[in-house]
Amino acid sequence: MARVKRAVNAHKKRRTVLERAKGYRGQRSRLYRKAKEQLLHSFNYNYRDRKARKGDFRKLWIQRINIAVRNEGITYNRFIQGLRLAGIELDRRALAELAVNDPDTFKTIVEQAKAALPEDVNAPVNA
């Protein structure tokens, strides 16, 4: 069997790992073994945080909407209930954007949601 010389491939592999680890602190950017291990962790963190980012943004939108509707004298869950009853199908992202950048339009949406709510808080919604 012929001998396989891997020097070129090995150097290329190590160089790419060290290039990807550029910017890490200490040995993690200079030593191949440490850099490789850190890259594996980094890929896992990256994957996990890409999933978590979606929930983080949803929480942020809910907080922004909650602050804006409380200034109008209604709670967040009553506002969402009013939107459903009024047939307004705006997602939380759009509502948060309106609350921050266009308060007048958001105020009219809140008024429509308030109008759609039943007067009695404990009244059944379907009645």
UniProtKB/Swiss-Prot annotation:
Q: Which UniProt keywords apply?
A: Ribonucleoprotein, Ribosomal protein, RNA-binding, rRNA-binding
Cellular component GO terms, alphabetically?
ribonucleoprotein complex; ribosome
List this protein's GO terms for biological process. Answer: ribosomal large subunit assembly; translation
User: Domain of life of the organism in this record?
Assistant: Bacteria
GO MF, any single term? structural constituent of ribosome
> Coiled coil where?
none
Give the Gene3D superfamilies listed for this entry.
6.10.160.10, Ribosomal protein L20
Family as reported in the entry's similarity comment: Belongs to the bacterial ribosomal protein bL20 family.
Q: What does this protein do?
A: Binds directly to 23S ribosomal RNA and is necessary for the in vitro assembly process of the 50S ribosomal subunit. It is not involved in the protein synthesizing functions of that subunit.
Supply the NCBIfam families for this chain: rplT_bact (TIGR01032)
Q: This protein is called what? A: Large ribosomal subunit protein bL20
- Source organism of the structure: Bifidobacterium animalis subsp. lactis (strain AD011)
